[in-house]
Curated annotation (Swiss-Prot):
This protein's name: Urocanate hydratase
Cofactor requirements of the protein: NAD(+)
Keyword check for DNA-binding: no
InterPro entries per the UniProt record, alphabetical: Urocanase, Urocanase-like, Urocanase_C, Urocanase_central_sf, Urocanase_CS, Urocanase_N, Urocanase_Rossmann-like, Urocanase_sf
Organism: Pseudomonas putida (strain ATCC 47054 / DSM 6125 / CFBP 8728 / NCIMB 11950 / KT2440)
Main localization of the protein described in the UniProt heading: cytoplasm
Biological classification of the source: Bacteria, Pseudomonadati, Pseudomonadota, Gammaproteobacteria, Pseudomonadales
Amino acid sequence: MTDNNKYRDVEIRAPRGNKLTAKSWLTEAPLRMLMNNLDPQVAENPKELVVYGGIGRAARNWACYDKIVETLTRLEDDETLLVQSGKPVGVFKTHSNAPRVLIANSNLVPHWANWEHFNELDAKGLAMYGQMTAGSWIYIGSQGIVQGTYETFVEAGRQHYGGSLKGKWVLTAGLGGMGGAQPLAATLAGACSLNIECQQSRIDFRLETRYVDEQATDLDDALARIAKYTAEGKAISIALHGNAAEILPELVKRGVRPDMVTDQTSAHDPLNGYLPAGWTWEQYRDRAQTEPAAVVKAAKQSMAVHVQAMLDFQKQGIPTFDYGNNIRQMAKEEGVANAFDFPGFVPAYIRPLFCRGVGPFRWAALSGEAEDIYKTDAKVKELIPDDAHLHRWLDMARERISFQGLPARICWVGLGLRAKLGLAFNEMVRSGELSAPVVIGRDHLDSGSVSSPNRETEAMRDGSDAVSDWPLLNALLNTAGGATWVSLHHGGGVGMGFSQHSGMVIVCDGTDEAAERIARVLTNDPGTGVMRHADAGYDIAIDCAKEQGLDLPMITG
């Protein structure tokens, strides 16, 4: 048992430069990335260890955080630290090519895999919600989801508006760690956006980091700005302080017609992440402690109203989609029988990318030097010279995205290219072109690392939406391949009982041994995504597997 204190008035920042505080870069890297997750420029509520996504934490409590830091500092390169729901529980002798850290967060036996049981365990200090990259120490701020959101909006523009979103506007809500990416992604895709958020502090943070351009004073002002900017063909993002469950029905009532509707509130967690209509945030937080069941009920009732408004927009022929927060499920449980009439974003727009192992490849400069990221940007362009779409993304990212914490970059690439880039980055460290090692990781939202029937694996061709062997195999293979740290989580994105997913991070320290590990891991990891989709019968994935020489006994053998 440990002290369950989750609050500490402290500011944490990862060390910079090339001086070690641990015994090697293989242990320095997870140490810095853990600290980076709690950097006040990165985390949503770092003093309570909350990184993003409602209550997604980096460590179970402050005593556990202290002990993780202490253990990583002394860990040898033939030892592995085991972390159980944010608590360091053991160090065991392994070998130099094994992961230095293995993490399991929020996992529950299926019958008990619900918020009620999890919240009981959390209150007792026995569990921690790791979200996806919070408890796996590879969150890089809102940039981590910007490109995926951008790709979604661009593809929606191709499907519905002839390839251009100029003069169009997106209606959405939520400006937290994930939702905060939406306004910038819409702007980069060429659209205006109206972004509803119930916490002023989150709007302030997105304005400060240039993820949102302006704040409207009220709904009338917001609509006037939208009308002006769309008429001028400008892509400007507007924040509006308010509650989506109140504002969306009002927009329907007024006959307002957005060009696209989605949502990224923290609806996955009704107790901690979704403000009921008519409530203040202070009331919500206080009553969550004293009347949790009533709070959950009120939040889900508001979600039902919110989703009904989204359905009303869809009935008007407006492209409407779920952005992976499980709000449709919550509404269905509150009596909205047709909540799933509008699709999730993955089957609607992203799955063809997943079939080729393309997903949110990301890296961070442990040096803390922005120039190291700019050099890697140039290397990506050099090694992938003919992808104009990717080059445009990198140019826009450099111009518009503010680094949060350690400088980092997100770049959606797939099987073949990930290993190529990783080996090139490792060589840049070896030659001294980069001033310190880099880490390469990804979101758990990737092609082969998640089972989530209401999000990434919704409407799989063969009906295998809920089969969760795939992320388990992904984690096992990345462990065998020698990733520097590997994580296996439950409940990220869509909440308890609705997802299982795995993550990996690998260090490029410039050594020959690192190159061997990089070649294995960055081939195998996206390879499992191609495998998973080929197994489900997707022709794009089957063709990719054959082109890339994957050995899939039932398909290519």
